[in-house]
């Protein structure tokens, strides 16, 4: 175990490991997948550098709900005990067409029977700090501008991405640029993944994609023991409109309220998510006391690539993880757990590669993804087309 003290590097200085140093792994992006990957690699003793363009804590658009699957990963990283300000909840309450169904989380041999609601503002800072405490060198406020490629390394069969040996990075506070080099590079820069696209990743447009919008509201239901999902939203005339809504209590006087819809709905291109949010707020159960007057600021949103719809995910020296690989669950829109898990799966393959297995170990990452999600995601993609 690497017991080095946390090191949040100053991006205006040379690499703390020395000029010309080559790290074992460079991770681009400090969200769930990147920080998870950094933690597991650093915990195993590898020399890891992580660059994150924002400075933690920072806002991040998300539903903020952690399922038992996420909690398991946080517990394995030793983080659950730090969730002191998070709201613990017991399950999901579903509303649809006048019916209500309470679904408590079941007892399970691998996962707890509870989840948490916590803002990504707080959560991502905790996980990133944990990676640093494990020994990862974290460069905050540092943007990866472009990959550094090695044209002398041939692209092996089955590797869809070129050989990447680092990144040109910029200190966003000064504008200074430099290179960070590594034997392997992990792309973990989220759903938009500019770094991944620069290497050649793209979304399979035949696969489903989601759109979502969320905002924070004050509510007397802020400490409810269930998160809520609303599977029918109606407009001002009472007609059902495409999309779904959620209300996730944060336990601190606030609730996270959002709407989403899938590209598999033939009407989705004509939907304005702002109008959809207004409709949902107007039709939400009255006990939540939601209205424009209780909003705590403007809603924010984004697009959600799902079901491993982004590729290639494998290069001669590169792996793509989390939202950058489109790992969001098509069934429920959950992304955090799959970010943690794919970061961990990538760390396992990279550890094997660094131990001598090289590219053969990287190929096992794809096999691990298939074992973990392949059949489930294929069923999910088929289901949401119905």
PLM-predicted stretches and their roles:
Residues 130-288, 292:
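Predominantly flavin-linked oxidoreductase catalytic cores and closely associated redox partners
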Residues 42-62:
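Glycine-rich FAD pyrophosphate-binding loop
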Residues 1-25, 40-44:
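Extreme N-terminal leader/targeting segments of oxidoreductases
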Residues 71, 76-125:
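A conserved beta-strand/loop capping segment in the N-terminal third of enzymes
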Residues 30-31:
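Glycine-rich Rossmann-fold phosphate-binding loop(s) that bind the pyrophosphate
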Residues 265-350:
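FAD/FMN-dependent oxidoreductases across multiple families
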Residues 348-386:
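C-terminal helical "tail/cap" subdomain of flavin- and related membrane-associated enzymes
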Residues 55-75:
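Conserved N-terminal glycine-rich FAD pyrophosphate-binding loop of Rossmann-like flavoproteins
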